[in-house]
C-alpha cells in the first residue's frame, strides 16, 4: 500500500513537472518553462485529453503567434487520445481562421478529435513520426434524463457525426461513404496507412 502511494506520488510529480530553460542575455539570465521557450519557435503542443481549458490555451497561443507574424508557419505537435468534440472544434475553427499555415505533427497518438486536428493541417505539411498511431471513430456520448431530452441529444450527436465525417472527407479526400464505414468502430492506422488514407502527407524519421 505504501509502495503504491509512493509510486502514485512519483507519477503525479512527473506528470506536473515542467522543465525550465535558462538563457544567457547581456543583462543576465532569463528562465522559461520549456513550452514557453518552444512557443518562441512557433511550436505548440496538444497533449493529453482535449477539453475546454486546454483548447482555450491552444487557441490563445495560435492567435498570439498570428499576431506576432501572420506570414510564418505554426507547428502543432499532437499526442492526444482525443476528447470533447466542441473543445476540439474550437481549435479546428481557429486553425482554419488564422492566416499562418499550420503544420501538424503526430508523435505517439492522434485519436478521435485529435485525428481530425492532425488531418486539418495545411496540405503538404501534415506529418507523423514513424511509430505514431492514428485512430478515427464515430462520436461517443451518453445522456441521462427525460425521454424527450434523450431524443434531443441523440439527434444532436448524429448531426455532429455527419459534420465530423464531412470534415474528415474534405481533408482526406475519402468519400463520405467510406468515412462512415470506417468510423463505425475504432479504426487504427499506422503512419504508412495514414498516408494512404490521406490523413497525413509524409512520415518524418529524421530532421532534415
Swiss-Prot record:
Keyword Cell cycle belongs to the record: no
Reactions catalysed: Hydrolysis of proteins to small peptides in the presence of ATP and magnesium. alpha-casein is the usual test substrate. In the absence of ATP, only oligopeptides shorter than five residues are hydrolyzed (such as succinyl-Leu-Tyr-|-NHMec, and Leu-Tyr-Leu-|-Tyr-Trp, in which cleavage of the -Tyr-|-Leu- and -Tyr-|-Trp bonds also occurs)
Family annotation (PROSITE patterns): CLP_PROTEASE_HIS, CLP_PROTEASE_SER
Annotated signal sequence range: none
Broad enzyme group: hydrolase
GO biological process: protein quality control for misfolded or incompletely synthesized proteins
Subunit structure: Fourteen ClpP subunits assemble into 2 heptameric rings which stack back to back to give a disk-like structure with a central cavity, resembling the structure of eukaryotic proteasomes.
Protein name: ATP-dependent Clp protease proteolytic subunit
Organism this protein belongs to: Buchnera aphidicola subsp. Acyrthosiphon pisum (strain APS) (Acyrthosiphon pisum symbiotic bacterium)
